[in-house]
Amino acid sequence: MAEYEVIVIGGGPVGLFGTFYSGLRDMKVLLIDSQDELGGQLVTLYPEKMVYDVGGFAGIQAYDLAQRLIEQAKMFGPDIRTREWADTLEKTQDGMWVVKTDKGGEYKTKTVMIAAGIGKITPSRLGAKGEVEYENKGVYYTVRRKSEFQGKRVLIVGGGDSAVDWALTLAPIAKEVTLIHRRDQFRAHERSVKEMFEVAKVYTWHELKEVKGDGNRVTQAIIFDNRTKEEKTLNVDAVIISIGHKGDLGNMLKWGLNMKGRDIVVNGKMETNLPGVYAVGDIASVEGMPKLALIAVGFGQAAIASSVAKKYVDPNASVFAGHSSEMDKFKK
């Protein structure tokens, strides 16, 4: 059975950085991810979306950010297993952990870093009439290629960051962008909301009732005011339903972790209630701290978890190993 000092579960941005930092701390690392390719939501959901809230970049395309993180994660030669789902976590008699996967893999490790985000992702659906019928025929749940919306009349449903960001992203290339939200308050950055009102038609207190088409593609959408019930028919070529995604954590919920809803509870050292097991990123809920689901926050958590794990593996090691600019690893 292969043996490691740390197994990182989850190949999104935080897991990738945790893989890099664990390698920086000279630990033998295995990264396990259930997707076909590394990068998490940056790659699977919005590869062409611009990311602005990561330090060092005034703006970077999600796919490009993922590629840089993957390159960084591979610097110290970690083992990587994609298309494998971490199924069980078991404690051995010698105090180590064994991670078993759905593909029959068994991996022994001294520590585990869980960076699983919200788990396996599926889009949240509205249940509007015609929604399923026209899925991938004009009804979408994310934007993988902006070019598909060039010159089209686009309706966006949602009021969060993703919905607002897609309105801003598509406005310059689409023929027309309309956004509807069931409330009049948006769960997005204030500046982005302000800019959205300048470039898109916005209907607050409105919901999607029905998607219509000619059998091959979307041609219309019926929306309604949820206060007055008044309906309005819009001529559209595409409907983007951006109301979030559902995550499946699978058997992780049975691992004996202290959970708060769907989050794993950790202390300031990113330690869970299981010795040698840490949680970072969107899946972690730090006691006494506000939750900010930001990549930048996850990077810091991953560095903390890696450093604390190093001390767990080697009690003589320092938690803080110094600045990377001073390390021999990077001196040529």
Curated annotation (Swiss-Prot):
FAD binds at residues 33, 41, 46, 86, 121, 282, 325. Its EC number is 1.18.1.2. Its cofactor is FAD. Keywords: FAD, Flavoprotein, NADP, Oxidoreductase. It catalyses: 2 reduced [2Fe-2S]-[ferredoxin] + NADP(+) + H(+) = 2 oxidized [2Fe-2S]-[ferredoxin] + NADPH. Binds 1 FAD per subunit. Coiled coil: none annotated. One of its GO terms (molecular function) is ferredoxin-NADP+ reductase activity. The keyword Oxidoreductase applies. Gene3D superfamilies: FAD/NAD(P)-binding domain (3.50.50.60). It is an enzyme of class 1 (oxidoreductase). Signal peptide: none annotated. InterPro entries: FAD/NAD-bd_sf (IPR036188), FAD/NAD-binding_dom (IPR023753), Fd--NADP_Rdtase_type_2 (IPR022890), Ferredoxin-NADP_redctase_2 (IPR050097). Belongs to the ferredoxin--NADP reductase type 2 family. Homodimer. This is Ferredoxin--NADP reductase. It comes from Metallosphaera sedula (strain ATCC 51363 / DSM 5348 / JCM 9185 / NBRC 15509 / TH2).
